Amino acid sequence: MNDFWQHCSALLERELTPQQYVTWIKPLAPVAFDAAANTLSIAAPNRFKLDWVKSQFSGRISDLARDFWNAPIEVQFVLDPKAGQRSPAGATPLAPRAPLPSANPAPVAPGPASAPAVDAHAPAPAGMNAATAAAVAAAQAAQAAQANAAALNADEAADLDLPSLTAHEAAAGRRTWRPGAANANSEAADSMYERSKLNPVLTFDNFVTGKANQLARAAAIQVADNPGISYNPLFLYGGVGLGKTHLIHAIGNQLLLDKPGARIRYIHAEQYVSDVVKAYQRKAFDDFKRYYHSLDLLLIDDIQFFSGKSRTQEEFFYAFEALVANKAQVIITSDTYPKEISGIDDRLISRFDSGLTVAIEPPELEMRVAILMRKAQSEGVSLSEDVAFFVAKHLRSNVRELEGALRKILAYSKFHGREITIELTKEALKDLLTVQNRQISVENIQKTVADFYNIKVADMYSKKRPANIARPRQIAMYLAKELTQKSLPEIGELFGGRDHTTVLHAVRKIADERGKDAQLNHELHVLEQTLKG
């Protein structure tokens, strides 16, 4: 077991950046290997590390274990606060521990040491009169009550997931950590990420840029360089899996590098709603407000989840006003243009519009290829451009779908012991490609666009040229080129036998105007989301 872990650690150290290795892999320790059940238990020192390693590195560790023992190995992660102190070279295999459940219960803050139980009716010690004994008992009872109250407050604070301001300030005063720093500062790094909830892997360096997201990336970099000054708030919107969350984590990580003492918090809108409810139940709104109003950077993801939640919106409005007044930066993401989010108070919508709103579009072909090539490289796999282009051409919706497809291809190749070719890719993605081809057709595009612009489907094939017909027809041609595998001549034939040059002109015209016309861009975004279901 220890030989394997030394081998595994050495490989991961070569594959990962120094920051990733020191932060996530080095604190782990193997604690048990059950040869009969083919299970390996690995301990992590805290819940945050355990959850992250489990989600990001368990697959790679399982692969290395299978290669090492020449058998499928189930890797289980367990919690052990002393994991980072273990020495793999001298570790003694322990009995296998039960794996932790997948749910993430709220962390329990360590309370003060339990006060000794007080028996008010116990006889007084020798030499102590009854009055003195009663006074001592009363003092002990008060001390116990105070300890219990402190423990209760600590539990509630942990459940609310609000790091204390004193913890923030203390860490800010002593923190000198940078990515790749020595082990002495790894504890400070852990503390930073646990408080901020930032994902240190999501940076500007590994964000693939193309026409679809270059404006959003430029705005994000500007905000990271000048928080609270350039664009406040910065509002990013777009479909699922297009990189909104990656970008806002990148901003937070960049600010931590530039200003290690900055008070930063990433939170999903659902968690914010949950915290508001808990604060209301516990009458802890003073703590809630003090925490959120004191931040330097608030990153709130998927704000559409605030829809219909008036108390949450009210609290967020006050937090927003306080942060902006203090020149703190607010960054928000949504799946929809701000004014299109239903169930949100008008005064919040007006605040969203007061900064910069930027759309992130589905990646274009070249960008999808670049994403696949980079992801394959990070997995230590050589992927030919032919295969990358094939996958990128057939899967168009978002980055997560591309990465999921690549994982299927890699697993299929490894399982069958075959080289990754276009033929193998077709086999691996057979079901996915069938669904994609069935979902979107030119006929469906024509009907959807006609309904959207209130014209007849027959107008798509006609020779009529009024602007209210010609424009939707050009948009339908553009979407047919973007969302189907049809060639230009095939698309032209389906639009009333038009020449392929007519289709090409329409595609180029709409693509060019999309980058300049915010209203057109929004309409296309709505149509694309509708067609993709």
UniProtKB/Swiss-Prot annotation:
InterPro entries hit by this protein: AAA+_ATPase, Chromosome_initiator_DnaA, Chromosome_initiator_DnaA-like, Chromosome_initiator_DnaA_CS, DnaA_C, DnaA_dom, DnaA_N_dom, DnaA_N_sf
Residue segments, region Domain I, interacts with DnaA modulators: 1-72
Positions of the UniProt region annotated as Domain IV, binds dsDNA: 414-533
A GO CC term attached to the entry: cytoplasm
Oligomeric and partner information: Oligomerizes as a right-handed, spiral filament on DNA at oriC.
Family affiliation: Belongs to the DnaA family.
Protein name: Chromosomal replication initiator protein DnaA
Source organism: Burkholderia pseudomallei (strain K96243)
Gene designation per UniProt: dnaA
